[in-house]
Amino acid sequence: MKQLQTALFISVIVASISAHAANPSNVFVGAWVVQDVVGYSDTSGGPPEAKRLLGKTMRIARDSIDFDGQRCQPSDGFTISTVDTAPKLLDYYQIRVTDAGLPQKTVLLDSASCAPIFRMDARRIVFGWDGVILRAIKQ
């Protein structure tokens, strides 16, 4: 009986660890340093604004995003979903997947009030800020 209890306990622990690792919200949480500029719109600050943002750190927590001295904390929380990248990228930033270097399907961190963030891969994200589209790497 004791062996069965031990086996059951271990199974529950392994299952909970696996479920926690598979939680997509964890892929965004952390510090991300802006490495390069994907593009910018006519309404942005142009190259000077883009250069100013290089090297800045975005901090993503479970319930907030901090970047460039501003905090965004959506009252309704974040939505995390796997999306077809092309239509979402065009809708949010008016750029093509090939310009951003994103995969055809990706994970999107979204909310009603914060900048949408696309997961490029395990260590890179793409997001827009004041009309500048940026790529950042996990610190």
Predicted segments with their positions:
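Positively charged n-region of N-terminal signal peptides that target proteins for export
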Residues: M1-Q5
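Short hydrophobic/aromatic-rich beta-strand segments that constitute the beta-sheet cores
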Residues: V34, I65-D68, I125-G128
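Contiguous, well-ordered beta-strand patches that form the walls/edges
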Residues: V38-Y40, I60-A115
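Sec/Tat signal peptide C-region and signal peptidase I cleavage site
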Residues: I17-A21
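Short, hydrophobic/aromatic-rich segments at coil-to-beta transitions
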Residues: G30, G101-L108, A122-I125
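Tryptophan-anchored aromatic micro-motifs
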Residues: P24-T43
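Short, exposed beta-strand-loop hairpins at the edges of beta-sheets
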Residues: C114-I137
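Bacterial N-terminal signal peptides
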Residues: A7-S16
